[in-house]
Amino acid sequence: MKEMDCVEVIVEKKIYAKDGVHKGMQGWICDPEFVRGTWLVNFPQCGENEDIATISVKEEDLKQIDVMYAAVNERIKAQFEKAEQASGDLSAYQV
């Protein structure tokens, strides 16, 4: 992988979820440095909406994809927000 590659998160982890990033979300590697097995990844939303997060993600938790669709991130974010409102507990929620 390298800077500007499009990637998808392939696991659900609490460390990513605390920043609003969940399995299936798509982003792009926004820094050329590969640090301690991680890439800095930006997870955008569509248009003028604020980005979900820019966080370090382990390379093993990513897969490279050809094209990134920010609408996927908005859909996943909405699912988690809806589940959180309904139960207040996301520990058993899966995408």
Segments the model singles out, each with a brief description of its role:
Residues K2-Q64, M68-Y69, V95:
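Basic/aromatic-rich interaction segments and small domains that mediate binding to polyanionic partners
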Residues V67-V95:
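Long, low-complexity intrinsically disordered regions
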